[in-house]
Amino acid sequence: DLTRDVCCRLLSTVGLCANEYIEREVDGTLSGGEMKRLEIATVLAKPHKLCIFDEPEAGIDLWSFSMLIEQFEKMYKEKKQSLILISHQERIIQMADRIMVIEGGKIASIGQTADILPQLLGKTADSYSCLKCR
């Protein structure tokens, strides 16, 4: 079980005020950004070897997006977690080791970011799966 102190630290890590969220039922009043940050805190509470995030940047503000990138980097570098990030955001794509491009529901290309990224310039695809793997 998580102690109150651990919960406070996790919420603080993702920029949420613990006093607002601990010992209170979350009743649907959270913004999209707050909900994303709460989801990240939940993942941080019990780290896994592999974490998958589908468009983690959706519905969040610029500050939350920066915090999200920082948390992903920490999860990868410090906690040695592999991440699969499904995103169209250039910043998320650039932080990936490998990219898989999906077009028409099929894999169009997959490989190292340095090899695939130049092919993506000026193009759109159904989705990009960005992989940070160990």
Which residues are covered by each model-predicted region?
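Hydrophobic anchor residue at the start of the ABC signature
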Residues: E39-I40
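ABC ATPase C-loop
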Residues: V43-L44
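Walker B catalytic motif
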Residues: E55-P56
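Helical segment within the ABC ATPase nucleotide-binding domain
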Residues: F65-E78
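Conserved H-loop
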Residues: K80-Q94
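ABC ATPase "signature
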Residues: I110-G111
